[in-house]
């Protein structure tokens, strides 16, 4: 079965490493190679939609999954997979003193991002928000969003919308927030991915981050991905 769609994470996957925001030239060239081969490329990121669309424009990508699956921009139309008001829980989280809000939160709707200030931040935030919310780390920030949605849910929605089997979708990621999309499709984890991401993926490539993405694209274009 041939891959039809490539869903790529951004931070830690298209970057030089998992602790920088600098994009990898090798990853960008691989992304262009994938796009030019006929694959439909989708950017899947924890970032807010406005930021994601801006980055996507410069990457030559049209379709975006933003806020860890809460929002999807497909063929020029934005779809919301979440509902609710995050302002109250946002105030509760900030009141712990364990985090500071990301500047992007002003432009976010459902997935709120926070910079941790203390140890065990995940546990502290989970304790105050209770059930009904997902709290996890991307390696760049702590993310809090309504339960029931992640990148995997978004990829599944995308497949139904485009009438494509999830077996014909290759996903590439590096962190815990990518687990959903790595497990629901033909997942490829870069070499320096978290253990959870590696466990969820079908394949773990040797190279890290951007170089790993290049390796993943070569695997996909060779025909060795999206196989039974």
UniProtKB/Swiss-Prot annotation:
GO terms assigned for molecular function: magnesium ion binding; phosphoglycolate phosphatase activity
GO cellular component, one term: cytosol
Keywords from the named record: Carbohydrate metabolism, Hydrolase, Magnesium, Metal-binding
Requisite cofactors: Mg(2+)
Active site: 9 (nucleophile)
Superkingdom field: Archaea
SUPFAM superfamilies in UniProt: HAD-like
Record: residues binding substrate: 151
Binding, Mg(2+): 9, 11, 174, 178
Recorded catalytic activity of this chain's protein: 2-phosphoglycolate + H2O = glycolate + phosphate
EC number(s) from the headed UniProt entry: 3.1.3.18
NCBIfam families per record: Pglycolate_arch
Family under the similarity heading: Belongs to the archaeal SPP-like hydrolase family.
The protein's role, per its UniProt record: Catalyzes the dephosphorylation of 2-phosphoglycolate.
Protein name: Phosphoglycolate phosphatase
Species of provenance: Pyrobaculum islandicum (strain DSM 4184 / JCM 9189 / GEO3)
């Amino acid at each position: 079965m041939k891959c039809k769609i490539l869903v790529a994470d951004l931070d830690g996957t298209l970057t030089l490493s998992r602790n920088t925001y600098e994009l990898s030239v090798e990853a960008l060239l691989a992304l262009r190679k994938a796009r030019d081969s006929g694959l439909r490329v989708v950017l899947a990121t924890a970032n807010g939609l406005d930021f994601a669309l801006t980055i996507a424009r410069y990457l030559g990508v049209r379709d975006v999954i933003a806020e860890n699956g809460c929002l999807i921009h497909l063929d020029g139309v934005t779809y919301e997979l979440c509902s609710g008001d995050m302002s109250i829980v946002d105030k509760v989280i900030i009141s712990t003193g364990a985090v500071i809000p990301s500047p992007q939160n002003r432009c976010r709707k459902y997935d709120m991002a926070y910079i941790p200030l203390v140890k065990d931040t995940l546990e502290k935030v989970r304790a105050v928000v209770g059930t009904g919310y997902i709290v996890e780390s991307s390696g760049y920030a702590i993310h809090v969003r309504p339960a029931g949605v992640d990148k995997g849910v978004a990829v599944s929605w995308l497949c139904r919308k485009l009438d494509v089997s999830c077996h014909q979708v290759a996903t590439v990621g590096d962190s815990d927030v990518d687990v959903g999309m790595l497990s629901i499709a033909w997942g490829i984890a870069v070499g320096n991915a978290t253990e959870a991401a590696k466990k969820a993926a079908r394949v773990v490539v040797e190279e890290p981050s951007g170089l790993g993405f290049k390796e993943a694209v070569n695997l996909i274009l060779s025909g060795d991905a999206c196989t039974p």
